[in-house]
From Swiss-Prot:
It is found in: Cytoplasm. The keyword Endoplasmic reticulum does not apply. This is Uracil-DNA glycosylase 1. Keywords: Cytoplasm, DNA damage, DNA repair, Hydrolase. The keyword Hydrolase applies. Disulfide bonds: none annotated. Its EC number is 3.2.2.27. CDD domains: UDG-F1-like (cd10027). It catalyses: Hydrolyzes single-stranded DNA or mismatched double-stranded DNA and polynucleotides, releasing free uracil. Its main location: cytoplasm. InterPro entries: UDG_fam1 (IPR002043), Ura-DNA_Glyclase_AS (IPR018085), Uracil-DNA_glycosylase-like (IPR005122), Uracil-DNA_glycosylase-like_sf (IPR036895). One of its GO terms (biological process) is base-excision repair, AP site formation via deaminated base removal.
Amino acid sequence: MAPRPLHELVEAGWAKALDPVAGRIAAMGDFLRAEVAAGRTYLPAGANVLRAFQQPFDDVRVLIVGQDPYPTPGMAIGLSFAVSPEVRSLPGSLENIFRELHTDLGLPRPSNGDLTPWTEQGVLLLNRALTTAPRKPAAHRGKGWEEVTEQAIRALVARGTPLVSVLWGRDARNLRPLLGDLPAIESAHPSPMSADRGFFGSRPFSRANELLVRQGAQPVDWRLP
């Protein structure tokens, strides 16, 4: 991530929303450059670290919170739960998301794990930590990204426009107090270790659309190619 002004790194609405933590974002850029200088790398690739904030701030109507990027090289693309379209063996969490998508809405299994079409529908796929080290899950948690992503959520809430949050797992549910009176769908994480404890059968996609319509917003078209 090059040392560039925030407005050159993210969409204009996000640049304004994240201005209170611009210093923290710059510090995280310094941290990542220091990692590279020390012979260590990070995921996702630099151009994708802030990718979640490249979709229009004002268009976000659903927030899906993840933990941190997939640590397997070649998978993470800067959107929570999504992987590069070239990835053939999908992570277990994503397989379970697709299974629930079919159960909930009857949609066929997508051809790949790239969730970019959801972002074009106003779905923000946001990890709490935006980077990690290769093959080291949660390596960059507690380094400062949480300050950035929590500010992002506060800014979304402050808009006063329709928003539904989908909180999978304890880490995501810990963000519930930031959401005020806005609706949230909470369940177990889609990980194979926990999906049977409340994720399967939770119908997050249809419920999100129901909650959007109640707020006067258009539902999301959850279909993926």
